[in-house]
């Protein structure tokens, strides 16, 4: 799920500031997003079929409200904004996991079984010496933002960057 507007602008601005001040730039390879399914390989010739199947699946799922607020970490390697939602987000992820296994023949990954929704701001290239300063910079953003999610975006890696290739609408409320 790739939010637009203010939240995307703030995340990008923080990523650019981290790059400028500490040369932390890996997170700039993708827009700020909340992952529902980890990256997977898929036959490019069947991409249109993939999109159609995902459109059909998501057209039955209701939009949801989530809140992006607060900063947390995974160890000393990943700094992210926390995502809070009711059970509808976990249900969507579980349903998508089942759909991907059944309809796309994709295997369950560890991250599919241990879902922890978040929005990464810095990861992989955060040096230990910069970690606390980077975390403090992100915490200063003091984000507390409700988000109405009415679409899910399909990202594809092109020329080393993740780009949205399709926005898939969810059912109207």
Where are the language model's segments positioned?
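Basic, often amphipathic N-terminal segments
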Residues: 1-65, 86-145, 162-173
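Short hydrophobic/aromatic-rich beta-strand segments that constitute the beta-sheet cores
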Residues: 36, 80-81, 121, 154
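Charge-rich, low-complexity N-terminal segments
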Residues: 75-78, 82, 87, 91
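Low-complexity, intrinsically disordered Gly/Pro/Thr-rich segments
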Residues: 138-140, 148-156
